[in-house]
Amino acid sequence: HTFAPTGTPECVKSSAQFGDDWYGPYMGFDHVEMMLLGHNWFLPEEPPRGQHYERWFFADGRGHEKNAAYQQNGRDTKGAAQTHHSMLPVAWHNSTWTADRAIAWMRDRPEDAKPFCGWVSFPDPHHPFDAPEPWSRLHAPEEVDLPEHRTRDFEGRPWWHEAVMTSEPAGEAEHANIRKNYSRIPPQSDAQLREIIANTYGQIALIDHQVGRLMNCL
């Protein structure tokens, strides 16, 4: 994230400079398809901002409907921080889109093509803990094993660990709000930690499924 335009395609404030027909080359790759953020605390940018995922997300005119579905919580999560069972259909999730685009790229290659390198990067697992249903329900929170050490402890850690979590963020109000309400997670109860971990397992399982699709294509 940057506070000013950088002129590069991954920058939110510069992304509108890159048209619908831009696919690289960039950063050593001949063909590039990108999403700007992928962590859905920041909803997909509406065109003309955004990159390939965001433009696809809004292309059918239902982008705001999809965002509303994402923000619906399918069940109680005991107040766990940044945790919900997203009602966004899996077909629109960025993990699915990432695999879809990689598979399409591989299938478009000629049969006599040289060996290739494809970098397929999934944004998850990451907070917010927002696996879509039914993946979010694969692991029962009450069956999650908790780590032995799970309370906040700054003793013996570099000074900046505590500073990051407890100091008043500097800068503009928008950026300070992000530091307070997104980058930081308050202490959680055991029940809340189980909700967070179970949902994270759902994110990982969805990625495992997409990797399986990639392997089948290969």
Question: Model-predicted segments: where are they?
Answer:
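Short, solvent-exposed turn/loop segments enriched in Gly/Ser/Thr/Pro and often Arg
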Residues: 1-12, 121-126, 151-161
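Short glycine/proline-rich turn/loop motifs
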Residues: 75-89, 175-198
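Catalytic-site neighborhoods of secreted/periplasmic enzymes
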Residues: 1-88
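A long, amphipathic alpha-helix that forms part
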Residues: 92-110, 146, 186-218
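Mobile, glycine-enriched helix-loop/loop "lid" segments at the mouths of ligand-binding/catalytic clefts
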Residues: 141-162, 168-175
